């Protein structure tokens, strides 16, 4: 190699090293981005039910977080239990039963915002946890949910029916999460007993 070639080589070397470093930085950023997306997707799958709503693990984590908070003041819990699921499964098959659950899940998911989270915590059991809430807001949510269910039922042969019950932790009636969920659950089952015997209409679930 002649002196001129060596000089050119020496001049090019820093540029080559700079480009190599830039390429490595881009590769590292790309790997980090992909890894972050994969981790986010894994987390989402871990806390999402097959119906697309938050699952029981997400619910349990929310309960733990509220238990570890300074207080549960103005936390509300609404419990739901679908009626007639066994009848749908027995008469129309489990696929229709799954669609019955999915239809309710999709409607219930619509109540969510930064303070309100909806969960499927059992086969036909659902829960909504509200923070910084009050009885007026809960009744508004329940009324809105009922209107949406009524619209759905007008368009579909199998009618969604559900029992509900709620409780709020207030200054006058302060509850920790275990007692709060128990009281909401108890009111839901009281509502379910009142609705017992209600018959399933239609023969087909259209979604």
Kindly give the residue locations of the regions a language model identified.
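Short, small-residue-biased leader/transition segments that mark boundaries at the very start
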Residues: 1-3
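Signal-transducing coiled-coil linker helices
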Residues: 9-49, 57-67
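Conserved long alpha-helical elements within nucleotide-processing catalytic cores of c-di-GMP signaling
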Residues: 43-46, 54-76, 83-109, 119-123, ...
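A short linear hydrophobic-aromatic micro-motif
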Residues: 114-118
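Short beta-strand-to-loop capping motifs
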Residues: 128-133, 168-170
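Catalytic-core segments of nucleotide cyclases and related cyclic-nucleotide turnover enzymes
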Residues: 139-146, 150-154, 168-200, 205
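PAS and PAS-like sensory/regulatory domains
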Residues: 158-163
């Amino acid at each position: 190699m002649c002196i001129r070639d060596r000089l050119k080589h020496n001049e090019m070397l820093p540029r080559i090293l700079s480009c190599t470093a830039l390429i490595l930085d881009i590769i590292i950023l790309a790997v980090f981005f992909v890894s972050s997306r994969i981790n986010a997707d894994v987390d989402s799958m871990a806390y999402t039910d097959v119906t697309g709503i938050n699952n029981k693990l997400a619910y349990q984590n929310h309960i733990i977080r509220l238990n570890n908070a300074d207080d549960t003041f103005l936390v509300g819990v609404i419990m739901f239990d679908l009626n007639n699921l066994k009848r749908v499964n027995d008469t129309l098959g489990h696929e229709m039963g799954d669609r019955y659950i999915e239809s309710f899940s999709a409607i219930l998911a619509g109540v969510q915002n930064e303070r309100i989270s909806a969960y499927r915590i059992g086969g036909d059991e659902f829960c909504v946890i509200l923070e910084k809430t009050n009885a007026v807001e809960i009744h508004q949510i329940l009324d809105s949910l009922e209107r949406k269910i009524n619209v759905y039922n007008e368009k579909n042969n199998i009618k969604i029916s559900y029992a509900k019950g709620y409780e709020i932790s207030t200054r006058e009636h302060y509850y920790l999460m275990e007692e709060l969920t128990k009281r909401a659950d108890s009111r839901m089952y009281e509502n379910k007993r009142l609705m017992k015997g209600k018959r399933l209409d239609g023969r087909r679930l259209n979604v």
